Amino acid sequence: DRIAVEIPGVTDASKILEELGNPGSLEFQLSDGTVFMTGDQVADAQAATTTDQYGNKQYVVQLTLTDEGAKTFGEVTSENVGKALPIVYDGEVISYPTVQEAITGGTAQISGQSTFEEAQTLATQIRIGSLSLQLSELESSVVGAQLGSQAISSSLKAAAIGLVIVMVFMIIVYAVPGVAAALALAIYTALVIATLYLFEITLTLPGIAGIILSIGMAVDANVIIFARIREEIASGKSVITAMKNGFHKAMSAILDGNITTLIAAIVLMGLGSGTVKGFAYTLMIGIILSMFTALVVTRWILYSFYWLGMRDEKFYGRAKERKTINFLQKRYVFFAISIAVIAAGFIGMGVHKASGQNSLNYGLDFMGGTSTTADFGKEYTIEDIENDIIPVVKEVTGDSNIQANKVEETTQITIKTRTLSKEERDDLNNKLADSFDVDESTITFQSISSTISGEMRADAVKAVIISTICMLIYIWFRFKDIRFGASAIIALIHDVLVVLTVYALMRISVGNTFIACMLTIIGYSVNDTIVIFDRIRENLALKHGKQTREDLMEVANRSLTQTLSRSINTSITTFIMVFMLFLLGVASIREFALPLMAGMICGAYSSICIATELWYVMKVHLGKNKITE
C-alpha cells in the first residue's frame, strides 16, 4: 500500500507527485492505438539486470501479470509477434516494446533501457499507473545538491583516513601479521566496493556509515587470530604450528561473534526504513566479507610471508605472561557505577518531561512533522533565531510550536514545524530566500506523516526485542548454558540504557538512525562479550572434577586478563573509524557517530566489567547446578 520513489536531481518536492502521474492511467495498446489491457491487470513490475547471449549487461523490467492479464496478454502477443505494443502512461508513451514471441506464462521482460536507473523509472511508472487508488504523501525528503555532495565526500574522506590509521596501528602493534592484516583490509575494502557495484546497491549516507563501521569490525577477527598465534608461540610451539593452532582456536570466537552481529543486521533489514536498510545491507556485506578475508585472505598472506623466509618468531611476537587482574573483586563497584549512570539518564528524562518537553529529543522520524534545514550564510545567536527567523516561519506556517536549532560548526539552522503541505513548503522556501538571502540549493526539507512516525517507534522497540531474543537463543545454543546468554543479554540492556542516557542528557535527536545505532551497539557489544565467554568456556574445559567458587573466579579473571589486550586493540581500531566519521562527517552523520562512540566505549566496559561478573554471580547463585562452595 506504499510506493517509495527516489529521484536524483529533482529539487522541487511540490511537483514530484504530479510528475509521477495519476494512478490507474496505464494502458497497453496495439500498434493502431487500440487498448487491449489496462493497469489493473498488472501484478508487479521490478527493475533487474541480466546478460545477453554475448555476456553483455542488460537493464530490463520484469513484468508480472494477474491471471486475467496473463490470458489477455498471451492471446494478443500470439497474434502480434514482431509488432510493437506501446505502453501508455498518463497519456504518454513510456515504452515501445516489440513482441519477440508469444508470452503465455504471465511474466514478460521489457528490454532496451540504457541504465538501471532508467529501468527503475519505467518499473515505478508501471506500478503507479496500475494502482486503482489515489496517492497521498506519507514521507518526503529533498536534499540540496551542495549538502549531498558534501556529505558523501566527507564520509568517504573519513573512511579513507580511518582506514590508513587503522592499517598503521596494526603494523606497529603486530609487525608482520599486522602487514598481512593491512593487505587483507585493503582487499576487504575492494571486495565491499565491488559487491556494492555488482549488486547495484544504492549507497546512502547510513550505508557509508555501515561500511566504515564494518571496516573497524573487520580488524577484530585479525586481532583475535594474532593474539592466539602469540600465545601459541609463548607456549613453545614453532611458528608454523602456532599459525595453524592460532587460526583453529580463533575460529569459534570469530564465527559466534560475527553471527550475533549478523542477527542485528538481518533484523534491521526486516524492520528498518529505506535509509536504515541501506545501513543494514552494507553492514551485512561487511560482516560476511570480513570473515572471509580474516579466515582465508589473511591466512594465505601470512603463510606466504612464512614461506618467503620470515620464519623467526621475532616477526610474529610472543605473548607476555601477565599477572591475572582480579576484576571480579570489584564487581559490585562496577555494578554501582552502571546503576548510577543509568539512573542519571532516567532522572534527566524525568526533568525534561516535567519541564513540558519530551523525555527524549524525538526527531521527525518518531514524531511526525516537517524539518527544514537551510544555510543562512552567517552565524545567528539563539536570540536572533527566536526574534528574526521564527516569526517569519510562523507567518508562513501559522504554527505556534516551532523549534529551531543551530547545526554545530556550520551556518545552517534546522527548523521543525507541523507537517507542511507542498504549497506551504514552497512558500517557506521562497520566504527564506527573500527575507534572509538563503541560497535555495542549500535548503532541504523532510516530511514524515504521523503514520510513518508511529510505525518507526514501534519498529524501534520491536527490532531491539527481536534481535535480543534471537541472540539469547543463539548464545544459549552455542554455550549450552543459559547463564551465558542471560548475562550477555543483561549486559546488552545495560549498553542500550547507557546510550539512551547519552541521548537524553545531550538531547541528541532520536530519529531514523537511532534504531541502527542501538542495534549496531548491541551487535558490537555481544561480539566483544562472546570472545571473552569463548575463552571462559575453553579454560573451564581444562578444569577437571568438582569446581569451587574460587575456581570459577580464577577462571573468569584469567580469561578476562588473557583477552584484555584484544578487547582494547579492537575497541581502538573500531573507535578510530567512527571517530573519523564524527570528525569529518556532516551534522546528520555526527548525530549518528556520537552516540555510537559512546556505545562502543560502554560496550567494551560492559564486556569486561559487567557481563563476566554477572555470569559468575548467576553461576554461584542460580540454576540447578549452582556452585555453593
Q: Where are the predicted features?
A:
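A structural signal for conserved, well-ordered secondary-structure elements
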Residues: 1-629
